[in-house]
Design a protein with these regions (language model features):
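Sec-dependent bacterial lipoprotein signal peptides
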Residues: 1-18
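Active-site-proximal beta-strand/loop segments in catalytic clefts of secreted hydrolases
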Residues: 58-61, 87-90, 113-114, 148-149
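Thiol/disulfide oxidoreductase modules built on the thioredoxin-like
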Residues: 106, 114-158
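Structural microenvironment flanking redox-active thiols in thiol-disulfide oxidoreductases
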Residues: 67-104, 116-121
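N-terminal "domain-start" segment that seeds a small globular fold
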Residues: 20-47
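Short active-site neighborhood of thiol/selenol oxidoreductases, capturing the structured segment around
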Residues: 46-64
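The canonical Cys-X-X-Cys-His
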Residues: 63-66, 133
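Hydrophobic beta-strand anchors of alpha/beta hydrolase catalytic cores
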Residues: 55-56, 84, 133
Length: 163
């Protein structure tokens, strides 16, 4: 019996490790999908198909400062200097979340599924207020966490420091 329990425990552990190796898929409110992969030993986050710095932008539907942050992030996304990914913390379903993204003027992918939000929140060590932006270098290492409203120049400065 002890041997059987050990085999079952080993099998469960192997499945957990195998699951950690794969890409996690997220559906964006604009209907596109993106995939990410987190390596806990290296503390790196990769976004499939992305080879440049990126920003995870955590926001909520009723946050005025979040809406004020969006134009600067839209400009960064349009410049091609960084990929911006929005994370809507209080999602209410794909249609409602797409409406929130439109209302805030968001022109970058934004995920809101509960599992995706929890996944990204856990990776960054928790979110204790919005807006929160976490800037990653092109290798997927978090380099700066900005809590609150910041000018575009703060993001540009961080991006320049990485080059």
């Amino acid at each position: 019996m002890k041997f059987l329990n050990l085999k079952v425990a080993a099998a469960v552990f192997a499945l957990l490790l195998a699951g950690c190796d794969g890409w996690k898929h997220h559906l964006s409110s604009d209907g596109t999908s993106l995939a990410s992969k987190f390596d806990p030993s290296e503390r790196t986050l990769k976004i499939e198909g992305n080879d440049k710095p990126f920003v995870l932008f955590f926001y909520t539907s009723g946050c005025g400062a979040c809406k004020a942050q969006v134009p600067a992030l839209n400009e960064l996304q349009a410049s091609g200097d960084a990929l911006i990914i929005g994370i809507l913390g209080d999602g209410k379903g794909l249609e409602a979340d797409a409406a929130v993204a439109r209302e805030k003027g968001i022109k970058f992918p934004s995920v809101s599924g509960a599992n995706s939000v929890k996944y990204f929140e856990t990776i960054v060590g928790g979110i204790f207020g919005t807006p929160t932006s976490v800037i990653y270098d092109k290798n997927g290492k978090a380099v700066k966490k900005l809590i609150g409203l910041y000018p575009k120049s703060a993001f540009e400065t961080q991006l320049k420091l990485m080059n």
